[in-house]
Amino acid sequence: TRDPGIKTTGPGYIRKHGEVVGIAVAVDGWEGYYPIAHETPPNMDKELVTRWLRKQCSYESVNYIFHNAFYDVGWLTTMDIDIKGKIIDTLIAAPIVDENRFRFDLNLLAKDYLKESKSETQLREAAKMWGLDPKADLWKLPASHVGEYAEQDAAVTLRLWHHLKKEIAGQNLINI
């Protein structure tokens, strides 16, 4: 997202300031990134991607997995995308598994539970080359430098959910 002021005034979707610049999705065995509003082209047709995503989110029988769903779903709402299925948030599920953790960020959870981490090397190198902050200015980079990172984000979230789901069942926490 392009979300100026998030650290000082909160998420832009509430203030109607900012926009979604790309959509990362993952299913078992595949992940993809659809750039729609990066400052530096090329981007895909925003309306075409939005229509496709709206259709994908219209299935009531599908579980939609997020890490920090409150944020992502808030931005999807600004695109008139309504998720019809069940929303599952790994940021909520992780403390159910271990409420004594100090941090629940995606990278740390992936490292601890999946023994993997997202590679930010390419993203950081590209940001440095462009003179940008790799996270705050991600939207200014061409999608070719962001896509792999965004795809990893979606894929790791899905794998983390598979792990947490087993833990929740194994600890008999399903009804919590």
Question: What is each of the regions a protein language model found here?
Answer:
Residues 1-18:
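Entry/capping segment at the start of metal-dependent catalytic domains
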Residues 18-21, 25-170:
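Active-site-proximal helix-loop-helix substrate-binding element of RNase H-like nuclease domains
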